[in-house]
Design a protein with these regions (language model features):
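A short helix->loop->beta-strand "cap" motif at the edges of active sites that frequently abuts
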Residues: 12-19
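N-terminal cationic-hydrophobic initiation segments that often serve targeting/anchoring roles
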Residues: 7, 11-12, 47-51
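Generic structural signal for well-ordered alpha-helices
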Residues: 3-8, 43
Length: 101
């Protein structure tokens, strides 16, 4: 609801603006504070906001794909929920692909 409200206010004040929403990376499944279903629900809520002028970069899906071949420590700086250099590169790549598409 808060994100929807923020997007609505931006679009109201700046109707020609475009908004990029970013669904976050996954946290470590072994850590109690980052259950996977939480990230999928958040991504799905953001997807419901996609409309003309509002786009989504689905880093949740990118992380799911990466974790099929890599370990959490390959993507994170702390092994839990903060991307390392490679993880930040994935974020930048996702946003740039959207902008350049």
């Amino acid at each position: 609801e808060q994100t929807a409200s923020i997007v609505a206010r931006i679009r109201e004040k700046l109707p020609e603006s475009e908004v990029i929403l970013v669904a976050t990376m996954l946290g470590n499944d072994e850590w109690i504070h980052t259950p996977r279903e939480m990230f999928n629900r958040y991504r799905d809520e953001l997807k419901s906001l996609v409309s003309p002028g509002v786009a989504l970069v689905d880093m949740t899906a990118v992380w799911e794909e990466q974790l099929q071949a890599k370990e959490m420590f390959d993507l994170t700086g702390n092994g839990l929920n903060h991307p390392n250099d490679f993880g930040h590169r994935l974020y930048a790549q996702g946003v740039l692909e959207l902008i350049l598409d």
